[in-house]
């Protein structure tokens, strides 16, 4: 496909406008100058997405089906939707063409994973400054010893055009028909595990970027004898690590932000020979009904007062009044309002985001039918069964079309 060679040509274009790894304050300023976000009263950036982009869209999330990985993916699973290589090439071509036409292109070079032995280098290229800022919040700086990583020579490339839309006629018969539109979908979140390329096109929900990379790590790490987990993690004063597994909205971020325990991370981790390590550099917390008395750490991280060029928290789809204050109880836009912020905005964190092997594992289940007791202590066999079964619920707003809790069996709480 020679995508990377074409991208290098783009980076060298005569008209310029390529802004690669620019300082964080300059990136925040670009978000404001380009009207991608507004400055709130506290200094955080407020942004809003189209109604079709207030949550993840599993039906538009696609995996390239190639002979190399054919037998390694459960294609019978409802969320593993295949796309053929030709269609994916079309998506890449459209993304590159869109980026070529952009006056400014924002590029960040980061990694996924705090453990340097399996940190994944990822270059994100977007025509939106806010996407680049989101990657600074959520993806980690490149460590000095990145050469130790099993992925050091296998970097991932992510092309993101969140506000542009695909031509439905061009993709007729290739992508699904979206019943809301009455024609072929104009959105795709697609990934090629073999060529290590991802495309986010038409989804302005910031979570699409982070979840694409989480999916990539979910696929690649088991082949390195590393277990990827959808969980938060914290550590007690004696070094005891706890994992809290659960789907989006079940309380991982809230429960792991404990003033008496150091936070490793709130959503995505690996568990390998060295112990537990956070994938991310920040948090992407649900904000609906956030109470500063009950959740002071998260509230402070999002809404502490600072000069906006030094703030950089992203408040997504929350109701903001003309005076720049927020009403976090107003869910008219979506019950899935979010706040993205770096871990360093929290008071009690473990900076290296790595810990030993967990002593306690908690499964957080949103039980829509009330069939489970509030708390259960599981035997080892029961825990293994529960991990494999993953009974829980999808919660309102976390995915497009989910308006009330919906029971689901999500294997491994992924």
Indicate residue ranges for each PLM-predicted region.
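N-terminal accessory targeting/assembly segments
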Residues: 1-156
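Short, acidic Gly/Pro/Ser/Thr-rich loop/turn segments
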Residues: 115, 207, 368-372
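Charged, amphipathic alpha-helical linker segments immediately N-terminal to NTP-binding catalytic cores
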Residues: 156-220
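Conserved glycine(s) of the Walker
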Residues: 250-252
């Amino acid at each position: 496909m020679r995508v990377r060679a074409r991208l290098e040509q783009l980076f060298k274009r005569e008209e310029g406008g390529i802004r690669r790894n620019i300082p964080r304050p300059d990136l925040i300023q670009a978000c404001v100058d380009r009207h991608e976000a507004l400055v709130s009263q506290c200094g955080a950036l407020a942004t809003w997405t189209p109604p079709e982009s207030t949550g993840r869209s599993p039906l538009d999330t696609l995996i390239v089906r190639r002979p190399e990985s054919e037998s390694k993916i459960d294609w019978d699973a409802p969320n593993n939707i295949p796309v053929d290589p030709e269609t994916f090439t079309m998506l890449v071509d459209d993304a590159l063409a869109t980026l070529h036409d952009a006056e400014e292109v924002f590029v960040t070079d980061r990694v996924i994973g705090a453990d340097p032995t399996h940190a994944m280098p990822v270059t994100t290229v977007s025509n939106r400054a806010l996407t680049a800022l989101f990657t600074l919040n959520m993806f980690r700086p490149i460590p000095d010893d990145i050469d130790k990583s099993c992925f050091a020579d296998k970097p991932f490339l992510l092309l993101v055009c969140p506000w542009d839309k695909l031509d439905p006629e061009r993709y007729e018969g290739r992508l699904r028909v979206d019943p809301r539109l009455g024609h072929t979908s104009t959105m795709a979140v697609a990934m090629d595990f073999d060529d290590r390329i991802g495309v986010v096109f038409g989804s302005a929900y910031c979570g699409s970027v982070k979840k694409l990379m989480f999916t990539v790590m979910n696929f690649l790490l088991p082949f390195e004898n590393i277990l990827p987990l959808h969980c938060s993690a914290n550590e007690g004063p004696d070094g005891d690590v706890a994992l809290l597994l659960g789907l989006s909205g079940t309380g991982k971020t809230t429960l792991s932000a404990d003033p008496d325990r150091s936070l490793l991370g709130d959503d995505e981790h690996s568990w390998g020979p060295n112990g537990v390590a956070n994938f991310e550099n920040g948090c992407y917390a649900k904000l609906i009904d956030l109470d500063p008395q009950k959740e002071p750490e998260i509230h402070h991280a999002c809404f502490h007062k600072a000069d906006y060029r030094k703030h950089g928290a992203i408040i997504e789809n929350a109701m903001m009044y003309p005076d720049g204050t927020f009403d976090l109880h107003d869910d008219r836009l979506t019950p899935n309002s979010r706040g993205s912020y770096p871990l360093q905005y929290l008071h009690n964190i473990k900076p290296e985001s790595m810990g030993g092997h967990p002593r306690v594992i908690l499964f957080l289940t949103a039980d829509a039918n009330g069939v489970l007791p509030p708390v259960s202590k599981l035997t080892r066999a029961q825990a293994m069964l529960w991990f494999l079964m993953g009974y829980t619920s999808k919660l309102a707003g976390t995915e497009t079309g989910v308006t009330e809790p919906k029971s689901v069996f999500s294997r491994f709480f992924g």
